[in-house]
Amino acid sequence: MQAIHTVQLLLKPSKYECQEIDRRFHALAHLHNVCVKHARKCMIRLQHDKQYSEALQLYHELSKKEKLSKKEKSQKSELSKKLEDRRIELGLSKAALERYLKVCGKRFSKLLSSQQVQTEADRVWSGVAKCLFENGKGLHFTKYMDFDTIGGKSNKNGARFDLDAMYVNWIGLSLKCYLPKSENSDAYV
């Protein structure tokens, strides 16, 4: 496994570069909130689905029992599979949210990479999973100011640092990096 290090370098972006970075964060916030809206709709459909609620009730009854017979164990696994299939049919899965945001993300393809959009869908899915399988209360919309980073699935994608030229390249945007002048500085590399 490779070690990952974080280096903080000083950026002095121009007015245009600041606006471009803001556009990217606004695009990410918009995509996140669109995905949350879609996931909420799917969760409401799931709550009102009679097949799902009946299967879920049976599943909970079996889960409360301490000792299960082989027949009950197989019935529980069948119910689990049935619940999962119904969630997938209604569009509540990690892959379904990624597919949904893929379509929405085409509009922002010059601002965000596809893997950055997929990562945002994964963040929304983790919230959905907490609501469905744990003690989560509900999904929340996120304000633009609450985003402090745009993540990706790997280091090969998104913002890339060019050590020779001292630039950060990020889908058509090049930002000049500056090293601190003295070795005593906290941010010295």
Describe every region a protein language model picked out.
Residues 1-189:
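Nucleic-acid substrate recognition interfaces
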